[in-house]
C-alpha cells in the first residue's frame, strides 16, 4: 500500500490576464482517497486541478505536496515524482493505436483491459477514431497503468454510459493513491460515500465537507 499522501492549495490565486480565476482558495486532498472539486463552468474547478498539477502558475499562494512546497516545481517534475493529470481534452495520442497508447504507460495492458474490457476489440484502432467515452476509458486506463501517487482527473465519466461511469468511479475510489476529480455535478455513486467535496463558485470555495453533508444541506 502507498504511504499516506496529500496535496493542497493554500491561499491560491490564479489570473488569466485581467481575470482572476481563483480568489485565494485553500483546500486539501488526502490520500489514499477520493476528493471531488465540484462546480459549474467558470467556477474554477478545472483551474484548481491544473494548479495542483503545475500546468497553470499561481499568482499568489502555494501548492503543497506531503508537506513540501512544490509551487515552483514544474509540471514535468511533478509528473516524474508520481503525479498523473488526465485533462478533459487531448488526453490520448490520437495518431497512435489504442494498444500503443496503453504501452506508453506500461508494457502489459492486462490491468487496463480488466478495468475496461470494452477496449479489447479496439486495440488496433487509432485512438483519434474512438468516441468521446471510449477515449475517456483509454485515458483513464493509462492513468491506472501509471500507478501514480496522485491522480488528477477532469470530468472522468464524460461521454460514458451510466454503467461505465459508475464502474469508473469504483475504480478511482479503489486506487491506492490520492485521487482528485473535477465535476460539474456530484456523481450518483458518491452521494452516500464519505468522499471529500469542495464546491467552487466564481473562483471561491463555498462548501467543504463530505458528500453526504452536501446532499443533506440541499435536501
Model-derived features with residue positions:
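Conserved beta-strand-loop-alpha-helix hinge in the C-terminal portion
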Residues: 204-219
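Conserved ABC transporter NBD signature motif
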Residues: 58-69, 81, 109-114
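ABC ATPase NBD coupling module
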Residues: 69-89, 124, 214-217
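Walker B catalytic motif
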Residues: 155-156
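Helix-to-loop junction immediately C-terminal to a conserved catalytic motif
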Residues: 53
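ABC ATPase C-loop
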Residues: 143-144
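The feature captures the beta-strand-to-loop junction immediately N-terminal to the Walker
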Residues: 38-40
Amino acid at each position: 500500500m502507498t504511504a499516506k499522501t496529500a496535496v493542497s492549495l493554500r491561499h491560491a490565486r490564479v489570473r488569466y490576464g485581467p481575470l482572476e480565476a481563483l480568489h485565494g482558495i485553500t483546500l486539501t486532498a488526502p490520500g489514499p482517497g477520493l476528493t471531488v472539486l465540484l462546480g459549474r463552468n467558470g467556477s474554477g474547478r478545472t483551474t484548481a486541478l491544473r494548479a495542483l498539477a503545475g500546468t497553470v502558475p499561481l499568482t499568489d499562494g502555494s501548492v503543497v505536496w506531503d508537506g513540501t512546497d512544490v509551487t515552483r516545481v514544474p509540471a514535468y517534475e511533478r509528473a516524474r515524482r508520481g503525479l498523473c493529470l488526465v485533462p478533459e481534452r487531448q488526453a490520448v495520442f490520437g495518431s497512435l493505436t489504442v494498444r500503443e497508447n496503453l504501452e506508453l504507460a506500461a508494457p502489459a495492458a492486462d490491468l487496463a483491459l480488466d478495468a475496461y474490457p470494452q477496449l479489447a476489440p479496439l486495440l488496433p484502432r487509432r485512438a483519434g477514431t474512438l468516441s468521446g467515452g471510449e477515449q475517456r476509458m483509454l485515458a483513464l486506463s493509462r492513468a491506472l497503468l501509471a500507478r501514480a501517487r496522485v491522480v488528477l482527473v477532469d470530468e472522468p465519466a464524460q461521454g460514458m454510459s451510466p454503467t461505465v461511469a459508475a464502474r469508473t468511479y469504483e475504480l478511482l475510489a479503489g486506487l491506492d493513491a490520492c485521487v482528485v476529480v473535477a465535476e460539474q455535478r456530484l456523481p450518483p455513486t458518491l452521494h452516500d460515500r464519505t468522499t471529500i467535496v469542495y464546491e467552487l463558485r466564481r473562483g471561491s470555495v463555498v462548501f467543504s465537507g463530505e458528500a453526504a453533508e452536501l446532499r443533506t444541506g440541499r435536501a
